[in-house]
Each structure stands twice: as structure tokens, then as C-alpha cells.
Amino acid sequence: MARKTPIERYRNIGICAHVDAGKTTTTERILFYTGLSHKIGEVHDGAATMDWMVQEQERGITITSAATTTFWRGMEAQFQEHRINIIDTPGHVDFTIEVERSLRVLDGAVVVFCGTSGVEPQSETVWRQADKYGVPRMVFVNKMDRAGADFLRVVGQIKHRLGANPVPIQLNIGAEEEFKGVIDLIKMKAINWNEADQGMSFTYEEIPADMLELAQEWRNHLVEAAAEASEELMEKYLEDGELSEVEIKQALRQRTINNEIVLAACGSAFKNKGVQAVLDAVIEFLPSPTDVPAIKGIDDRENSVERHADDNEPFSSLAFKIATDPFVGSLTFIRVYSGVVNSGDAVYNSVKQKKERFGRIVQMHANKRDEIKEIRAGDIAAAIGLKDVTTGDTLCDPNHVVILERMEFPEPVIQIAVEPRSKADQEKMGIALGKLAAEDPSFRVETDAETGQTLISGMGELHLDIIVDRMKREFGVDCNVGKPQVAYRETIRGKSEVEGKFVRQSGGRGQYGHVWLKIEPAEPGQGFVFVDAIAGGVIPKEFINPVAKGIEEQMNNGVLAGYPVLDVKATLFDGSFHDVDSSEMAFKIAGSMAFKKGALEAQPVLLEPLMKVEITTPEDWMGDVVGDLNRRRGIIEGMDEGPAGLKIIHAKVPLSEMFGYATDLRSATQGRASYSMEFAEYADVPKNIADAIIAEHG
């Protein structure tokens, strides 16, 4: 089967933004103008096509990245048909992982800003993630019809706060209630969209006389930015003072793809103005899969290899998202980098080293699907029937093995206990948590050995709220949720020698176990080290292992406050036994008793997780942020210059002091600072705090 759309006419783009910039509305309008949805879905009606989980429609925020394929020929049908694969990404800080994995597989992005609130903390986070993956992008300043909207002010913030080089390709005509349309600075014409047909048709008009001077000034900036693309263009510009429309567009495209400039457009998605021009700009200025560098990976001999966006190269693709679908089970979203694969073909998961077979392949339109027979280089689609694939795995041609760069996922930091409300919920909860953990690499599930409770951990409180909510809605599991907890641990700092004796002798068969242990710290990270130093058979061989088991059980149950003990070395060096009364059980209990007594004599301490915290803040708020970290027992480890005059503070802070930090940081810096945190190490809890925890649990 031949390719329907040549790869040069593909655009794989993400639409990213801060929570309320109007990103989902923008995507809805794109689907409307490209003919995919006949009735526009409004977010505030809870009907937006891209927000397809119930939680998203209720909360009015986007949680998962829905992927959609659409086609566009231009506002004036001036292009051949282009295929645009769009990924709508969430804007909330707890879901940054979703944004990260989308950016990893995109070729370009449209970053949406609100014309009133401009650059917000999450937009800074998204921008830094796009920088990390080198994603070329353009900007759409939305909500120009809102009170206080100011396009050029937002362009200024993009320059100063994000350290970017924005080049406006439009100016707004009027703002707030007076917002009428835009001036196209390349054509030097005004564009007015027809409100009667929801902006499906438009007219070019002369630029309003009172705006001509401003338009000419920004037009000059635009042409200068284009001229800087090459020496030839610069010479032509200096001689003629002008460049042709074709030259301007080619130069701006090249500089956008090289990440040297960011083109800026404006409009109001809600009022159906400007989105059509953004689609044209996506086609004219953002890269096709062949415009971006070939993806790098390693082959089965550990040599580095490249895969180009070419149907004739061996098949290679990256699984960037797993979703559970009520009708077909598991959907694996993949981005194809090279080659072709048909439904029914065998592929190789090079990360897991397993063969998989592609069952059906579907192209997603939000959560509706069309079945297709094959996917080719540059495609984004979902496969049904893959058995053991997780986010970040490479799927490739079994005869040409490659592992593409894996995505890195942060360690979860916050933990809550969940308990099923009934016996029926118990079984369903296990299945539900397993499926949710497969979908989301930043979410983990474990069982607390002492209490038997199920603990779930994730990136933040909203993250875990949504998980609990999805268990109820999608899997019908009712559960009670505990308060967020810190995972403390225990260890020892000193040495001791102790005797453990368990004797029960009162007529008939008794119990007799007797051991001497030497207890001391092990190397960090070693866990439990057991040394058998028994000589001359004072304890028979069959009773040695039970002693180790008894010690290990006591370690899991803790000695101070019931938290597991880490990094201890126990040497069994003496003891005695009884011919009749000794048993495995008796020695297990003796070992456990000796360890508890010995650990309490060996300077036991409580450990807490320290988090590596990185805060990006404008200089004005630096003193407040550092003062607050000191109050939270934080240790400042250093400071760096960030982009656009921001400061980056590196610190280590106990997790117990970080609950509610996102809210506190927002209010302390008027929402200008952002932070990330990940687990660093376990460290001793200060005595006064440890005593309180031990008193509570002991």
C-alpha cells in the first residue's frame, strides 16, 4: 500500500500550555476547522472532544495526552493536503510526566499563552521541557477578547522570562471586547473572520490607518529576523531593504526549525478568530519528520546508530503511552521513527528483549478510533494486542535491533494508604491498581508488610486524587484513603554483643534456642548482612538459617517506631542447643529476641527521606524562598543562573517538611517560582523530631 500523504507533508505537533490558557479550546477549534468535528465542543460545557476522561470533563483540565490525526489544506486551500498529528497535553504540575513523554515524540509544538495572564509557572516548566528535547515551537497568544489582554506584553514576557527570541508574525486589531481580527505582518494585510459561520470564512482587508505605523515597525523586525538566516539574505536585505514573501517564509521556517526564533501569533479560540492562521503557520513553519535530526539509539552490539524518517529503513518506534480502553483493553500509543509495520506483523521489544505481535492498529481521534492496516515513518497511532510493553520501550524490526533513548521518569514522593471497603472491592482493587500502574510510570503500588495495607505513591496530591477517582469510576472500586505519609526507616550507628535465649521447659517436649550475636552497621545500601561464625558445632547447621530468618523478620518490623531497619551486619558467633527441645522455631525466636535487644543497645536512629529540591525563582523572591527553605530544615547546596534572569536554588529538604509546598511557594512568589523534587537519600532525623515520632508509634 503506498503512502497517502508524503512524509514532507506530516506535522507531529503538541499543544502545550498552563492550566487555563485555553489549550483544549484551541485544539477543539483545530478539529472543527479541519473538518473532523461538526459541533465545536466547549470546555465549560464539559463536551470537549480531546478531554475524554470523565475526571477531565468535571475538573475542566486535561490529564492525559489524547492523540488525534487531522488534515489541513490552508485557510485559502493554498496547500496540498497536510496531515497533522496533534497531541493535547495537560498543564498541571502533577502531570508534567505526561507533557514530558509527549514532547519526547513530537517534532514541533504550539505553546498557548493567555493574553491576560501571560507566562505562568507551568508555562515555564513546559518551556524548559521543550528546551531539553530541542523541540521547535511557535506561540499562540489566546484569549485576546478577555479584559486586560495585551499581545505585545506577553511577547515581552516570553523574551525576558523564558529567555526565548519571539518574532511576532501578526498583530491584534483591537483587544478585549474590541478584538476584531489580526494583521498578517508577512502579507501586510488585515484578516477578519466571519462570525456568522464560526470563522470558517474570512476576508483580507487593508490595515486600519491608525495601526499602519506600528505594523510597519513590527514588519521590519520580522524581515530582519528572516534576513539573519543567511549571509546571502542579509546582503539582499541591506541592498534592497526588503525580501520577497517566499524568502521571508523559507528563512523563518529554517530559523524556527533550528530553534533560533519562536514565531508568535494571536487570537481568540473561543471567538473563532486566529486558530485557522495558526494551522497555516504550523504547516509553513514547523518541521516535518524529515526536517528534524535523525533519532539516535544503540544496536544489540552497543554501537550507536541512527534511524532516519524513511519508509525504506528498518522499522523503529517508541511506545510513549499506555491507556486502558473499556472496549479493547490495552492501547499502546507509538510514534514510528522509521520503516513500515502492518497489523499482524511481529516486532521486537528491544528493552524487554521479547517478541510482540501487532494485533490491530488504530488511528485515534481523541477517544474514537479508525482501524488502519499499516503505519509508516512519522505516524502516531495506537496498537491493540501488545502483551508486555511499558512506556518508553522501543519496538523495532526483529532483524535490525535498536534501543532508542529511554525516557526518564521521576521517583514518586508522596504515599497514601488505600483500603478496599468490602471483600468484593479487594480483588477489583488489585486489578485496577495494576492497570493504572502500567499506564503511568510515575505511579507505584506496594504492600506494607507490617500492616498489610496497600500503599500507593505518586508525584503529588492531585495525582493520587485522580488515581483514586479513576479506580472508582473505571473499575468500580470503593476505597478509603489515608493521609499522605512519609516513608521513614531505621538503622544503627554503634555496635553491640547480645545473648538471645528462648527456653520453654515444663513437662513434655519443650522449646530451647540460645544464640550470641554481634550487631554492627553494614555499608550503606547493603541491606542485611548475616555472617555464620559458629565453630565446633555449638549450634547444628539446620538451626543457623532460622536464626537469620528471625533477625530479618525483626528488621522488617523495626525496633524504634515500627519502620524497617536498613544496613545492618549480624554475626552469629556462639550459642547452645538441647538434643530434644531445640527446634527451628525456637532458634528463629531466639535470633529475633537477640536482634531487638542488640539493636536497641547499638545507638539506633530514625531515618527520613531527603529530597533533592530545585527551585527556579525570579531574583526578587530569592530571599523569601531561601528563608522558607531554612525554616523547613532545608540545606542550601548551591545557586545557579537560570534562563532569562531567573535564579535556580539547589537544596536538600526532608520530605516531611514539603507537604503543601507547591501552594506555599505559589503564594510567596505570586506564582512566579516553580520547583521540582526527587528522592536523594535517607538521613538521620534530628533527636527532638525523632522522639516525637517514636512516642507516637512506639
From Swiss-Prot:
This is Elongation factor G 1. The keyword GTP-binding applies. It is found in: Cytoplasm. GO terms for molecular function: GTP binding; GTPase activity; guanosine tetraphosphate binding; translation elongation factor activity. It comes from Vibrio cholerae serotype O1 (strain ATCC 39315 / El Tor Inaba N16961). Residues 8-290 form the tr-type G domain. Keywords: Cytoplasm, Elongation factor, GTP-binding, Nucleotide-binding, Protein biosynthesis. One of its GO terms (cellular component) is cytosol. PANTHER family: RIBOSOME-RELEASING FACTOR 2, MITOCHONDRIAL, TRANSLATION ELONGATION FACTOR G-RELATED.
